[in-house]
Amino acid sequence: HNYLVKDVSKLSETIHEAFEIARSGRPGPVLIDVPKDVQFAKAKYTPKSEVAFKPHRIKSGSSEIDSEFIEKLIEHIQQSKKPIFYVGGGCLNSGPQASHELMKLVQKTNIPVTTTLHGLGCYPGEDPKSLAMLGMHGTYEANLAMNECDLMINVGARFDDRVTGRLDAFSPNSIKFHFDIDQSSINKNVKVDYQTNTDITLSLKAINDYIENRGVNFDQSQYDQWWGQIDEWRGKNSLFYEQGDEVIKPQHAIRRLYELTNQTNTFVTTEVGQHQMWAAQYYKFSKPNRWITSGGLGTMGFGMPAAIGAQMANPEALVIDIAGEASFLMNIQEIATAVQYKLPIKIFILNNEYMGMVRQWQELLHGSRYSESYVDALPDFKKLAESFNA
């Protein structure tokens, strides 16, 4: 959405409506273009209570979930042999209560959970029912479980190509349920069997209430064979690495960072690249909204400004930007902002002197013909930070 304000008398109601649009339905940015003549003009302020929002612009989904959808979901859960919860960023955007309701439902049903890059933290990463992240950079067990499942319950994910791969071969034998407040995301990439265009918090709470009020019971041993197969896949230990005596591996560095900070009030942001994927794999988030990263757009230079914002909003928290050296350089001047506002953000740089993800693709697909992926002129980051009085 975007607005061009030509009349100053419309400015306050435009701002109110823009914030309503940004927060309703699937959250997203709204641009308000205020020309210079409007900036210098004066007008009476219109309070939000007096603004008549245009209904076609405020997309918030249904206010309640269809009971028939709930009954069908419970019926399929009870009949399935190999179910899985596939959870995306929509669960986080719905608010922390959505994660609480998801955990309740998972514990009742004994169904495994996998999350997207943006869904990390919706379900505790160290919980045995978590298969961690799926997709191109996900775990072996998560990807195999998605492919082999007979029931897929999509909670606020968009079936993006990093998860599905070839659409014609994606989870061919599963019944698919899709929860999404954005109607345009349903049946967009993958055809689903059942759908609800309802806020996820409301949906999951309604399902949990239905189960409790109707006395619905689930056989916890129903999926023993499924869990046995998953444990066999887990045995491959797809994220295994060996830490030697000479060089600190990035996986080890992030794992140790997690072990030393997971008991504190911590927010983690990242730049974009291999370090971002290692952070997603080895930092096990136990709470929602503690992981801030640029996924869909993949914007290098994102991490430090995001850390500054997180620290401003949470002054008592530990805020860490896990960065690669090339991505960090793209917004390095923001050290000045952090210093000026006395924000104690921590920058954790994994410096391998390469744009690692670019190099990785050049090795995999282009016969190791490297082009513009090696960074030869790097500063001493410690001295550079000190020059900003950091």
Give the role of each language-model region.
Residues 1-40, 117-120, 146, 156-178, ...:
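Conserved thiamine diphosphate
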Residues 89-177, 286-316, 329-332, 374:
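Glycine-rich, anion-gripping cofactor-binding loops and their flanking helix/strand elements
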Residues 17, 21-79, 239:
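Conformationally flexible catalytic loops at phosphate/diphosphate-handling active centers
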Residues 1-14, 36, 119-226:
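Glycine-rich, acidic loop regions that bind phosphate or pyrophosphate groups
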Residues 148, 187-189, 195-197, 201-205, ...:
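Thiamine diphosphate
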Residues 34-40, 89-91, 183, 272-276, ...:
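Glycine-rich beta-alpha junction loops
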Residues 228-305, 310:
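Active-site diphosphate/adenylate-binding microenvironment
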Residues 20-26, 69-84, 105, 146-148, ...:
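Glycine-rich phosphate/diphosphate-binding loops that line cofactor/substrate pockets in enzymes
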